[in-house]
């Protein structure tokens, strides 16, 4: 289990609150949604979330993503 995320990283995350983001997970899943909030462990809440598959999109709605499963968070196009 990884420790808390550094303060500069947490401050950078503020720029993405209330904007669409794409989250890539260790499992290979990709989830797109509006970043609502996060904590020091990078646990994040996404609004209007969708799981993006190879050939399909699954609507998830309000979703909690555990920080230890996150590989990268990028702005969604």
Curated annotation (Swiss-Prot):
InterPro entries: Lsm7/SmG-like, LSM_dom_sf, Sm, Sm_dom_euk/arc, snRNP_Sm-like_arc. One of its GO terms (cellular component) is ribonucleoprotein complex. Residues 8-77 form the Sm domain. It comes from the Archaea. Keywords: Ribonucleoprotein. GO terms for molecular function: RNA binding. HAMAP family: Lsm_RuxX. Belongs to the snRNP Sm proteins family. This is Putative snRNP Sm-like protein.
